[in-house]
């Protein structure tokens, strides 16, 4: 509990049970129900998104992708797009939790049967979403937090392994302020990736060392399209707030020469879709 508290998690109860006698099971159930009642759920995005963890072909059906639905809902017959390849197709069939389904929604395990798509065009790490709403990128502004127990140091321009959703991508961490990041420290960086990823603002990710592979840090996406003159991007990234609402206001001021509609801001802040209108009013 102390370990979780130090890392921003609300510690829940620890329950001792006996599978043979059943002792403690009822207390565990009661504590689980009580915990569920106090957990605050974030407003989910209305846009569908699913990170693909498996791709395979089945005789008589064709290509199937599986994953856990992160946001939104889709139904049989809907048009979707698969990123970063930007392949558009329709849903031929759906399965969820072992049975056929007409639709799947946030939290469901889903198997999506795709129409007229070859298996070799897709891979683990792809993202299934609605057409034209996501943009793959190789330049990302992030905040990195080092694991407190690691002996590793992240230095400027260091090559690392980044895990976004179900994908692993190699890339380099470019410093905006500190030349190195040590255990327990955090700072804003610009990631320059070797292949495109499909992510959104406020997505979390894990960083592993290139070799030997060890988990050394985690992070959050602050802005997903850090293109432009390096000196300008560096200053832009260095001052970018971690808090979503503060970052929203920061971006409005910074991008004031390129006005966006409310819908554009909703797409940009994909995970905070339902908060954007409220932020505008505030």
Region spans (language model):
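C-terminal effector modules of nucleic-acid-centric enzymes and ribosome-associated factors
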Residues: 1-2, 117-282
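Conserved catalytic-core segments of large NTP-driven translation/proteostasis enzymes
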Residues: 2-150
């Amino acid at each position: 509990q102390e370990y979780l508290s130090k890392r921003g998690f609300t510690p829940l109860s620890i329950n001792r049970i006996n599978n043979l006698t059943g002792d403690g099971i009822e207390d565990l159930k009661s504590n689980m129900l009580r915990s569920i009642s106090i957990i605050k759920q974030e407003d989910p995005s209305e846009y569908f998104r699913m990170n693909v963890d498996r791709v395979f072909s089945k005789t008589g059906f064709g290509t199937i992708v599986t994953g856990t639905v992160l946001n939104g809902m889709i139904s049989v017959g809907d048009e979707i797009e698969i990123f970063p390849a930007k392949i558009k197709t329709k849903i031929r069939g759906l399965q969820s939790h072992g049975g056929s389904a007409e639709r799947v929604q946030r939290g469901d395990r889903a198997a999506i049967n795709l129409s007229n798509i070859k298996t070799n065009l897709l891979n683990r790490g792809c993202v299934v979403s609605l057409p034209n709403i996501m943009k793959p990128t190789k330049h990302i502004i992030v905040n990195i937090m080092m694991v407190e127990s690691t002996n590793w140091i992240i230095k400027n321009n260091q090559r690392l392994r980044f895990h976004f959703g179900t994908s692993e991508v190699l890339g380099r961490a470019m410093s905006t302020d500190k030349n190195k990041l040590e255990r327990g420290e955090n700072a804003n960086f610009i990631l320059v990736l070797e292949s495109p990823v499909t992510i959104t603002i406020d997505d979390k990710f894990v960083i592993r060392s290139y070799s030997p592979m060890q988990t050394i840090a985690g992070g959050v996406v602050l802005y997903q399209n850090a293109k432009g003159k390096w000196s300008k991007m560096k200053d832009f990234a260095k001052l970018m707030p971690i808090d979503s609402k503060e970052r929203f206001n920061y971006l409005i001021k910074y991008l004031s020469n390129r006005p966006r509609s409310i819908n554009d801001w909703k797409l940009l802040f994909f995970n905070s879709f339902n908060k954007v209108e409220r932020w505008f009013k505030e």
